[in-house]
Amino acid sequence: MPKMKSVKSAVKRFKVGKNKIKRGSAFRSHILTKKPAKRMRNLRTAKYVHSTNVKAVEKMLGI
């Protein structure tokens, strides 16, 4: 049986570390002038995928 292919868009969006999956923040692409600097600073930091979504992301990544 051939190897399962990973979803390429998921490979570009997620990074796998020690038992956790990192993701970038949303709401940073446009209409940024009305968003406060504090909010933009907080959105720059990477987040972890929520426990309810981990199984789906792992399936997409082929883990």
UniProtKB/Swiss-Prot annotation:
> Which GO BP terms apply?
translation
Give one Pfam family.
Ribosomal_L35p
PROSITE patterns for this protein: RIBOSOMAL_L35 (PS00936)
Q: Which InterPro entries match?
A: Ribosomal_bL35 (IPR001706), Ribosomal_bL35-like (IPR021137), Ribosomal_bL35_CS (IPR018265), Ribosomal_bL35_sf (IPR037229)
- Kindly list the GO CC terms recorded for this protein: cytosolic large ribosomal subunit
* Coiled-coil residue windows: none
Name the UniProt key words of this record, in alphabetical order: Ribonucleoprotein, Ribosomal protein
Which Gene Ontology molecular function entries are recorded, alphabetically?
A: structural constituent of ribosome
Q: Which HAMAP family match?
A: Ribosomal_bL35 (MF_00514)
Similarity section: Belongs to the bacterial ribosomal protein bL35 family.
Q: What is this protein called?
A: Large ribosomal subunit protein bL35
- Species assigned in the record: Campylobacter jejuni subsp. doylei (strain ATCC BAA-1458 / RM4099 / 269.97)
